[in-house]
Design a protein with these regions (language model features):
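Active-site and adjacent substrate-binding regions of carbohydrate-active enzymes
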Residues: 1-227
């Protein structure tokens, strides 16, 4: 028979007595002392990204909320996520690694399509503070899901010329200007008022450095809006 977990569990008080210091906080502090040039990159449970950088002190954290919320068009929730970070400490935005797919998920094209929704989300990833991360085969528009155990591709895919072209025309020029978007001192998030209330489906923000400024607008829903 396989013993259940409850047979070997302990109360919170017992656990805190045996392990009084948070394990990962201790790791971060130890690494800072012994290997100060080490970059600590965390994969956090969904919606715990802020905790990993605020409390545990990780240098970077994979921001799965970006992919999941924008894919599901939970735009109000993601706007709230950004707002909460800005209210607490805007510098935390710089620690997020934003992405549209990873080896555990379907490819970016499979999740976002190959049209305006994909390229709007990709442009948003390229213009938010933090680190934009493009997945394997994303620029080529590949649809095969690559697991970490893959030694080579199983599908004989060829690059999607339309997808590659739009990356070259719309995304690469933005990435060449990452210096305008990577900091948070001039980052400002706006709310669109459409005459009836706030349109939470529209992401509007500006950023820049020195005398250079950029305004980003993205309507992440298949509808018309104005404001």
């Amino acid at each position: 028979a396989i013993p259940s977990r409850s047979d070997y569990s302990m109360t919170d008080e017992e656990f805190d007595k045996l392990i009084p210091v948070e394990f990962w906080r201790e790791v971060v502090d130890t690494v800072a002392q012994r290997a100060p040039d080490t970059l600590l990159l965390a994969e956090a449970f969904w919606m715990m990204e802020g905790y990993f950088v605020r409390t545990l002190g990780m240098h970077r954290v994979y921001n799965s909320a970006f992919m999941n919320m924008l894919k599901r068009e939970e735009n109000a929730k993601y706007r709230e996520t950004i707002t909460n970070v800005l209210d607490f400490d805007p510098q935390i935005l710089k620690r997020f690694v934003n992405f549209m797919n990873n080896p555990d998920e379907d490819t970016a094209i499979a999740q976002f399509g190959e049209g305006d929704k994909y390229f709007g989300t990709c442009a948003m990833m390229a213009t938010l503070p933090g680190l934009p991360m493009l997945g394997h085969g994303q620029i080529e528009g590949f649809r095969e899901k690559y697991g970490m155990e893959y030694a080579k591709a199983k599908f004989d895919e060829i690059p999607n010329g339309h997808v590659v072209y739009r990356h070259e025309q719309e995304i690469f020029p933005i990435l060449h200007h990452r210096w305008m978007f990577s900091e948070v001192e001039s980052f400002a998030l706006y709310t669109l008022h459409n005459g009836y209330g706030f349109d939470e489906d529209v992401f509007a923000y500006s950023n820049g450095i020195g005398s250079e400024r950029a305004l980003f607008l993205f309507n992440n829903r298949d509808k018309h809006t104005r404001g």
